[in-house]
Amino acid sequence: MLLDKSRAWLEQDNRAVGVHASDIMDPLQAFWRSIAPQPLTDREVGLFLPGKVLHAFVLGAVDDQKVIDLAVTDEGSFYSKELDIYFSPDKILNGKVRELKTSRSFYEPVDVEDIDTYVEQLLIYMAATNTLASQLWVLYLNVKDGDGNTAPAFRAFDVKVTQAELDEVKAYIKSTVNSIHQAIKTGVPDLPLCREWKCGRRRCPWYDRCKPPGRYGTTEFDKMPGPPKVRRSKKT
């Protein structure tokens, strides 16, 4: 019952028909989502729910709300005519996009590669809003200290690009959008593979229909998770 309620809450917002910012990063899933829509999997519900609730609390605190509105978890949906994509930034403050992420990582990032998936999405928002500077907010839920103890930690990172770099991002987005539209029109998904952590029988409901080349048929991507191991106390 709780799982069903959570799924209904996460899916309550109507998704506009078209290409969304998240589709740019995983174009094959965008194709399959368009031709064979699927509800959120149980795993996705469990992953998305805590982050969405925390979004409401953090963004509400930024707006100095006395009572947190759980229905407000981003700035709403926008459309970029230039790029032909829909996008929903978490916050636009003083003209700059601020994107909030929650992370279960035990360690803070050492370099940009440790937060590259977050930065990729933020760059798309920057392209859609035609801005050269933004901020990435990350709420780390379990950062370890020197003694191995864990505690939440909030970090903010400035992200800046040159106009030439922004134009390069825009060109990539436009090319990917055109490819997605063409794939949907023809029914032939001649598209780049999704990111590895979004691919596989355990992670993608379309995996057995998509059969991504180089991945399908391999143990790494084919395997399903086994039953969770439950620690049991010894009998006395």
Question: Where do the language-model regions lie?
Answer:
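Metal-dependent nuclease catalytic cores that hydrolyze phosphodiester bonds in DNA/RNA
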Residues: 1-97, 104-110, 116
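A residue-level signal for conserved active-site and pocket-lining positions in enzyme catalytic cores
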Residues: 26, 125, 204
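Metal-dependent nuclease catalytic cores in nucleic-acid-processing enzymes
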Residues: 56-64, 113-142
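Short capping loops/turns at secondary-structure boundaries
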Residues: 84, 111-118, 159-162, 166-169
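Residue-level detector of short, conserved catalytic/binding motifs and their immediate flanks
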Residues: 89, 123, 202
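A structural signal for short, well-ordered beta-strand segments and their strand-loop junctions
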Residues: 92, 96-100, 133-139
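Generic beta-structure capping elements
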Residues: 100-103, 159
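Metal-dependent nuclease catalytic regions and adjoining charged, substrate-binding loops involved
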Residues: 130-236
